[in-house]
Amino acid sequence: MTRHFSLLVDDRPETLMRVTGLCLRRRADVVALRYARSRGGRAGFARLELELVVSERHGHGLLERLGALVEVRDVAELRSTLKRSDG
């Protein structure tokens, strides 16, 4: 199953390795990653968008585990609004 996450993280060199390492340990394949440093009032932070392919079994609790990382300030799972067309 494909899952999408948006994270507000500390803009530090080890942040990407910690987040992707957690995904690897949970057997989630990172299929897309976007990292953008914050501008203006949120200096020192970055927005990290993740698209993961993970089994339901291994994905259980992934949102909570991502949020428990020290470098992660906020995490949200994004729901897909795309509808499949059968035909």
Model-predicted regions and their roles:
Residues 1-87:
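A conserved regulatory-domain signal marking ACT and ACT-like small-molecule sensing domains
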